[in-house]
Amino acid sequence: MTGYVANIEKLSIENENFRAVLYTDKNVQLVVMSLLPGEEIGMEVHHLDQFIRVESGEGKAILDGVEHAIGDGVAIVVPQGTNHNIINTSSEKMLKLYTLYCPPNHKDGTVHKTKADAEADEAEHFDGVMSE
């Protein structure tokens, strides 16, 4: 296989995991995420660039202290070094999104069912192994 082709909207909406890595190459990684009602990713900063697109739900993105309302179809670009957080503000509906890390941030094939699983996995950062 060369590259990755899939209906990312469908995969994002169907995903029930906090995080699932779908594809990893040396310069880019595709990940789907789902946040439970009221859940947040948590304030973080990366030494890489990140693109996020919301497929379903509502929430807010905080980039270097500035809050932005987000929902279906909203795109977020997070330049390296930016403190950021994504928060699901709904009390009923999951926030479904996908993200591109440039370069990769997680081990290829990583799946975290819950945020607690992700926080407990100390060895899940990108190790140089790609999807193909």
Please report, for each region that a protein language model flagged, where it lies by residue.
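A short, N-terminal "cap"/entry segment at the start of jelly-roll beta-barrel domains
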Residues: 1-27, 113-132
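A generic "binding-loop/recognition-motif" signal
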Residues: 28, 37, 47, 66, ...
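Glycine- and acidic-residue-biased ligand/ion/polar-headgroup-sensing regions
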Residues: 49-59, 64
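Ligand-binding loop in jelly-roll beta-barrel domains
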Residues: 60, 80-107
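Short acidic-glycine-tyrosine-enriched beta hairpin
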Residues: 66-80
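Helix-adjacent hinge/juxtasegments
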Residues: 43, 62-64, 68-69
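Conserved short histidine dyad/triad with adjacent acidic residue
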Residues: 15-16, 31-46
